[in-house]
Amino acid sequence: MKSDAFRHAAESKDFSKVGELFSEDVVFRSPAVFQPYTGLDSLKVLLGTVAEVFEDFRYVDQVETGDSAVLVFEARIGERELHGVDVLRFGEDGLIAEMMVMIRPLSGLNALVEEMGRRLAAASG
Protein backbone atom coordinates (compact mmCIF):
# COMPACT_ATOMS: atom_id res chain seq x y z
CA MET A 1 0.00 0.00 0.00
CA LYS A 2 1.16 3.54 -0.73
CA SER A 3 0.74 4.59 2.90
CA ASP A 4 2.88 1.79 4.39
CA ALA A 5 6.08 3.89 4.55
CA PHE A 6 4.23 6.70 6.33
CA ARG A 7 2.59 4.24 8.70
CA HIS A 8 5.96 2.73 9.59
CA ALA A 9 7.48 6.19 10.20
CA ALA A 10 4.58 7.24 12.43
CA GLU A 11 4.47 4.02 14.44
CA SER A 12 8.24 4.07 14.98
CA LYS A 13 8.22 7.85 15.63
CA ASP A 14 10.98 8.21 13.04
CA PHE A 15 10.30 11.15 10.74
CA SER A 16 13.91 11.54 9.61
CA LYS A 17 12.88 10.73 6.02
CA VAL A 18 9.85 13.02 5.81
CA GLY A 19 11.26 14.54 2.63
CA GLU A 20 11.06 11.15 0.94
CA LEU A 21 7.38 10.70 1.85
CA PHE A 22 5.84 14.17 1.39
CA SER A 23 5.88 16.69 -1.44
CA GLU A 24 7.80 19.92 -0.82
CA ASP A 25 4.56 21.94 -0.85
CA VAL A 26 2.50 19.48 1.22
CA VAL A 27 -0.69 20.83 2.77
CA PHE A 28 -1.29 19.79 6.40
CA ARG A 29 -4.76 20.25 7.88
CA SER A 30 -4.65 20.20 11.67
CA PRO A 31 -7.63 19.32 13.87
CA ALA A 32 -6.78 22.35 16.01
CA VAL A 33 -6.87 25.21 13.50
CA PHE A 34 -8.85 25.91 10.34
CA GLN A 35 -6.02 27.43 8.29
CA PRO A 36 -3.78 24.69 6.85
CA TYR A 37 -0.01 24.59 7.24
CA THR A 38 1.91 24.47 3.98
CA GLY A 39 5.36 23.12 3.26
CA LEU A 40 7.72 20.43 4.38
CA ASP A 41 9.47 22.52 7.05
CA SER A 42 6.24 23.15 8.98
CA LEU A 43 5.24 19.52 8.67
CA LYS A 44 8.57 18.28 10.04
CA VAL A 45 8.16 20.39 13.19
CA LEU A 46 4.53 19.37 13.71
CA LEU A 47 5.04 15.64 13.16
CA GLY A 48 8.15 15.58 15.34
CA THR A 49 6.34 17.36 18.16
CA VAL A 50 3.21 15.23 17.98
CA ALA A 51 5.39 12.10 18.07
CA GLU A 52 6.77 13.34 21.40
CA VAL A 53 3.30 14.14 22.77
CA PHE A 54 1.44 10.95 21.84
CA GLU A 55 1.90 7.94 24.10
CA ASP A 56 0.97 4.38 23.12
CA PHE A 57 0.36 5.50 19.52
CA ARG A 58 -0.83 2.74 17.20
CA TYR A 59 -2.78 2.38 13.99
CA VAL A 60 -5.78 0.08 14.27
CA ASP A 61 -7.11 0.20 10.70
CA GLN A 62 -6.04 1.28 7.23
CA VAL A 63 -8.03 1.73 4.02
CA GLU A 64 -6.66 2.79 0.63
CA THR A 65 -8.29 3.50 -2.67
CA GLY A 66 -6.82 5.25 -5.69
CA ASP A 67 -4.77 8.23 -4.54
CA SER A 68 -6.14 8.35 -0.97
CA ALA A 69 -5.54 6.51 2.29
CA VAL A 70 -7.22 6.66 5.69
CA LEU A 71 -5.33 5.40 8.73
CA VAL A 72 -7.26 5.07 12.00
CA PHE A 73 -5.22 5.46 15.18
CA GLU A 74 -5.45 5.35 18.94
CA ALA A 75 -3.15 7.17 21.36
CA ARG A 76 -2.94 8.63 24.81
CA ILE A 77 -1.84 11.96 26.26
CA GLY A 78 -1.41 11.49 29.98
CA GLU A 79 -4.66 9.93 31.13
CA ARG A 80 -6.63 11.11 28.09
CA GLU A 81 -7.30 8.45 25.48
CA LEU A 82 -8.07 9.56 21.96
CA HIS A 83 -8.98 8.18 18.57
CA GLY A 84 -8.17 9.77 15.28
CA VAL A 85 -7.72 9.42 11.56
CA ASP A 86 -4.95 10.49 9.23
CA VAL A 87 -6.32 11.14 5.75
CA LEU A 88 -3.57 11.11 3.13
CA ARG A 89 -3.83 12.19 -0.49
CA PHE A 90 -1.03 11.22 -2.86
CA GLY A 91 0.14 13.30 -5.80
CA GLU A 92 0.99 11.97 -9.26
CA ASP A 93 4.61 11.58 -8.11
CA GLY A 94 3.52 9.12 -5.39
CA LEU A 95 4.41 11.52 -2.57
CA ILE A 96 1.89 12.64 0.03
CA ALA A 97 0.50 15.97 -1.18
CA GLU A 98 -2.06 16.52 1.57
CA MET A 99 -2.60 15.24 5.10
CA MET A 100 -5.64 15.91 7.24
CA VAL A 101 -5.90 14.80 10.87
CA MET A 102 -9.13 14.44 12.84
CA ILE A 103 -9.27 13.57 16.55
CA ARG A 104 -11.98 12.69 19.05
CA PRO A 105 -13.14 13.14 21.77
CA LEU A 106 -12.91 16.87 22.37
CA SER A 107 -11.09 16.30 25.67
CA GLY A 108 -8.37 14.40 23.80
CA LEU A 109 -8.08 17.14 21.18
CA ASN A 110 -7.90 19.79 23.90
CA ALA A 111 -5.10 17.87 25.65
CA LEU A 112 -3.22 17.67 22.35
CA VAL A 113 -3.65 21.38 21.60
CA GLU A 114 -2.48 22.35 25.10
CA GLU A 115 0.61 20.14 25.06
CA MET A 116 1.55 20.98 21.46
CA GLY A 117 1.21 24.68 22.25
CA ARG A 118 3.44 24.35 25.29
CA ARG A 119 6.15 22.43 23.43
CA LEU A 120 6.10 24.58 20.29
CA ALA A 121 6.31 27.76 22.39
CA ALA A 122 9.27 26.35 24.35
CA ALA A 123 11.03 25.33 21.13
CA SER A 124 10.64 28.79 19.58
CA GLY A 125 12.17 30.44 22.63
Task: Enumerate the predicted regions with their spans.
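C-terminal and inter-domain tail/linker signature
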Residues: 1-125
